[in-house]
C-alpha cells in the first residue's frame, strides 16, 4: 500500500485525515464515560477553565496511548499477511467487522434513547401523581429537574463523582490522574482506526490517522470541559439545537464508520473478483 508521503504528493491523503479527525470529534460527543465524567467532575469541583483544559488533555493523552498500542499491534500483526492474494480477504473481513461495529453503535444509541424516553414517561406520570397528592395533603410541590439523555453507566459515574467531590478542593495532580484514568476506556472508533491501519499496511499513514483521531477527540473533550466550567446550561438555553446535536452525534459517527466499512468492502470484493 502507498506510503503517506506518496499519498500526500498525489493529493489522496486528504480523505483519511479529516475522516479520522471527525471520528475522534464525534466519539467525544457520544454519550459515554469521558464526556459525562469530565463534565460532572468539573461542575462538582467548581473547576476553572485551566483545570478543564488539563482534564481534557489528560483524558486525550491516555486515550491516545491506548489507541496507539492497539493500532501498532494491529500493524505488527498485519506484517504476516504480505501476500497480495490475502490482502483483499483482509479488506473484506475488516469491512464486515467495521460495518458490524457501526450497526452496533447505531443500535446501542437507539436502544439507549428509547429506554431513556420510556423512563422519562414513567417519571412524568409518577411526578404528576405525586404533585397532585402533595397539593391536597401539604399544599406544596416537589420540583425535580429533567436531565439530558445519557446512558445508564455514564449517569452512574456522574452521580458517584458528585458524591465524592462536591464542594471539595482538588489538586492539579488529582485532576490529571482523574483525566488519565477516564481516558483508558476503549471505544468502537479505536477499533475502526485499528482495522484501517491493518488494511493500509503503512506505518506513517497509520500513525497519522491515530494522531488525527486524537486531535478530534481532544477538541471535543477540551471544549466540553471548558463548557462545563463556564456553565454549559447557558449555552443550551441560548441555542436550542445544542442538546439535539449532542444526542444525534452517535448516529453520525456510526454512519461515517459504516461508510468506511462499505468503502473497504467494495475494494476487497473487487480484489477477490480479479
UniProtKB/Swiss-Prot annotation:
Its main location: membrane. Residues 34-56, 108-174, 231-251 are cytoplasmic. Pfam families: NicO. Keywords: Cell inner membrane, Cell membrane, Cobalt, Cobalt transport, Ion transport, Membrane, Nickel, Nickel transport, Transmembrane, Transmembrane helix, Transport. One of its GO terms (cellular component) is plasma membrane. Induction: By nickel and cobalt. Transcriptionally repressed by RcnR. It is a multi-pass membrane protein. Residues 1-12, 78-86, 196-209, 273-274 are periplasmic. InterPro entries: Ni/Co_transpt_high_affinity (IPR011541), NiCoT_RcnA (IPR051224). The chain crosses the membrane at residues 13-33, 57-77, 87-107, 175-195, 210-230, 252-272. The keyword Membrane applies. This is Nickel/cobalt efflux system RcnA.
